[in-house]
Amino acid sequence: MAEVELKRAGAIAYRESVSEGEPSGPPVLLAHGFPESSRMWTTVMAALAADGRRSLAPDLFCLGDSSDPGPATFERNLEALTAFHRELGLGRVALVVHDWGGFIGLAWASENPDLVEALVISDTGFFSDGKWHGMAEMMRSEQGEAVIGSLDRDGFGGLLHLDGAGFTEDDVDAYWRPFEHGRGRQATLEFFRSMDFSKLAPYEGKLGELGVPTLLLWGAEDKFAPLGGAYRFKQEIPGAQLLAIEGAGHFVFAQEPERCAAAVASFLGGHG
């Protein structure tokens, strides 16, 4: 397996994997979701490196190893992704997104259509009439502080396994760290409360206008971002391909890491 290195660009920590020799295509930029970090992409990044691709995965604010005293809102994470791409001089990229990373990454893609070579969209939403799931609604409510404040490591592990198994104990420890020692708890409230689906209205129709190859990779049993959302993306994006992983839930990259990595590498190898 190719080595995936943890690096830093200012306040943003990120993982990078580079193959030996000349890259075989544009860089791959990966945006993770809640409550994970760039760690979720390590198997995918190794598969991409084996195919000769450079890949980079930043940590969202206050998740993983990124640290910032400011609020971890949708807007600030979008600004951070934009700055990260610019400062590293990535140019055109293939973009891979999951969960929260979908809101942030797809907004970035919509605002920067000339910089997008291909898309892989996984278990997320990007529609202005979307609805939050029950856990998110609780975080957005006045109960949020009490709920997130009472969370311990065991409860956090239970949260990760609400939608199927797949995480190792090392995974749980790694993803729990910002909640135990950092601003992970407050960042959770800040992002959920800042992310009103109505904010996506300016992006309506933009993904379909990109005209780039798109793979929709979904856990067929996802309870947080159900498979129906994938079919809606398929209607909105001409030519989009759908791969639904049977038996997998929301955290499909943890539950089927090798299969997902192979699917992403194969798709981008042929299209981006």
Language-model segments: residues:
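Conserved alpha/beta-hydrolase catalytic His-Asp/Glu region
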Residues: 150-208
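Catalytic active-site module of serine/aspartate enzymes centered on a nucleophile-bearing elbow/loop
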Residues: 240-272
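Flexible "cap/lid" loop of the alpha/beta hydrolase fold
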Residues: 110, 118-148
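Alpha/beta-hydrolase fold catalytic core
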Residues: 1-28, 50-53, 90-91, 243, ...
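Acidic catalytic loop of the alpha/beta-hydrolase fold
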Residues: 221-225
